[in-house]
Amino acid sequence: MVYEMRTTLPLIHDEFKFGDAEQEFFEREGYYIFDRFLTDEAIEEGRSHIDRIIEQRAKGFVGTEMMAPHQLGEKWFWDIMTDPKVLDFAEKRLGPNLVLWHADLLNKEPGVGRGIHWHQDQMYWDQQQVRAPLANLWIPFDDVDEHNGTLSVLPRWHNKGLLSQATIDAADGAERTSVDEVARDGDFFGYS
């Protein structure tokens, strides 16, 4: 079953732009945060779809399980990922030949924790060691803070190349200074 999103719904704020200054910061630091990326209407619509998905799959659903909404026939999700502004961001990072390789909807219920160890996404998606460039993005549909799941990044670590998990785990605290961003629903985190 395909669930439609209103085609006239404004998805992305008009103010969103990934210009030269944003690109320069991204290249240097390995991430960029866009406040209020999604419109309030898109957040509300997305939440209603997310609530429906969780309710439909509640039987046997673990509180922190990931799902791939684009593979569930969720057109609203596909519409966000293929919005021209999102594609422009990805094209500036990767070039014109783009593939939506992987997408997750992660449900974190109140009181149900799920830690994710430090890692490089390239290790998961590039098993053939091709070193294909990646552009990751994360859009929370709820406000997040240090108590319920911020995204933590290690600035400039993308310049270290592909590291073994043992190297990442062994890095001392001084070398592994992270940026833990508090985010509002609808913000956009782009990272390498």
Enumerate the predicted regions with their spans:
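Catalytic cores of transferase enzymes with a strong primary signal for eukaryotic protein kinases
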Residues: 13, 22, 59-63, 132, ...
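Double-stranded beta-helix
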Residues: 6, 147-192
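Hydrophobic side chains in beta-strands
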Residues: 107, 139-140, 153
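Non-heme Fe(II)-dependent double-stranded beta-helix
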Residues: 1-29, 34-129, 166
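Short, conserved beta-strand element in jelly-roll/cupin
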Residues: 93, 119, 126-146, 182
